[in-house]
C-alpha cells in the first residue's frame, strides 16, 4: 500500500497551532487542489475534546469559508483528523499559509461570538449523526487557546522523515 503524504512528516517536530500544506494536486481540467493540515494541538501531546472538535466541525467550515473563499479560492471540505489534533482542509486554489492562518484566527474569533448552543448550524438529529455530542463551551475554549498562542507555519521540508527511517518504520 502506498504511504500517505501525511505519514512522511515527523509528527514529533510539528508545531501547533500551525498550518501546513499537506498536498497539492492538479485536476484534469487544470485546477489546483490544495490540502492543508490545520494542526490545533501538538501530536501525541494533547488532543481536542470529542464534543469540542465536533462542535468546531459544525462552526469552523462555515467561518473559514467566510474568511478565505474568493475569486481564486473555494473550500471543498474541512474535516476533523481521526487523531483529534486538528482538521484537514481541501480547497481549489493556492492561498498562502499566512492567508490560511489569518482566516483561521478570524474563524476562531467568530466561534467566540456564537451566543448559545442553539446557534450551532445543523445541530439536530436530521442533519447530524451524533447531535447530542456537542459543547459550545469546549469549542470556545479551543478557540481561546488558538487565539492566545497564535498560528505558526509548519514546512514539509523541515519535517520530512528521512527515507532510511521511512523504510525502517514500514510495515509490509
Curated annotation (Swiss-Prot):
Domain of life: Bacteria
Cofactor binding remark: Binds 1 Fe cation per subunit.
Annotated EC: 4.4.1.21
Any one Gene Ontology molecular-function term assigned to this protein's record: S-ribosylhomocysteine lyase activity
InterPro entries with a match to the protein in the record: LuxS_sf, Metalloenz_LuxS/M16, S-ribosylhomocysteinase
GO biological-process terms attached to the record: quorum sensing
Assembly and interaction partners: Homodimer.
Family: Belongs to the LuxS family.
Name assigned to this protein: S-ribosylhomocysteine lyase
Gene: luxS
